[in-house]
């Protein structure tokens, strides 16, 4: 009987599929983590491990060096020659890009030796380049005062020092009431011309705020002050984007204006050369300058769209705008609407998009059209003949 009991074996309890899967899944996950970690470590220290094991990863091969291995030959004997050439190219680009925007009563060019007072916080905070890939090393750039002095102008040092020490940033300006008696006294000795520098720092991913596309209240007050103390005012437009410039015609003594853009590392000297006529400005505007930024199709379309539960890597609070202008951006919009208005097509002459909320009128919307630019040269056309074919 005892032998029979021994022969009767108790059945083994089988492991459930769920438990089996859980155990092996965990083991495989740990194994995978270990493999990935080991792979990362081995890749990071592959060179050290290879050298420790005595393996070679580089083989030295004796090649025939009798031939010419200089595939890209430089046209310059030394780096100094190359730098001198690039400097000249930079200055040429700036010189040929400067646009003469306004020149009433032939206010420009100025005579060398003119005694000038340079106004505006931007005079000592001049923009040389944009941001991102458009930024430059400003360590050794030439200042506006240095450039004008080099070109034979006598610059008001007292006024220049005031702006250097003001501690303000564009578009804030030293208020007229804060001009010291010493500064105001200096105008008599440097009163041939006042130069006002207008600047804005917009660049890719950093568009201007609405209040920055026109004169700030500080700048308006400063221009009123300048006009009260000087009979001739010249404006330098240190900008790379289209802003509202109607104010150039609102101050009696603003007689000339030059769009100078951003001069880069070496282009600054070309600005006073354009002012004194060494360079004849031949540039043309590459944007349409409207009286009001609100008249553009983009402004009509722009809005503060939000994406619920969205994410924006640059921290723009999940904002978005649907691009709806198509090709009608800049001059394509203004010139097309002008043609449609003249031809009476569609509702182009409606007040929609008009800055004065009246019938749309090209002359009231566009201050400087695409491709605009004056010259010191006087042109004359005569002896026209028309032949009917």
Model-derived regions, located:
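C-terminal non-catalytic regions of proteins with extracellular/luminal or membrane-system context
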Residues: 1-389
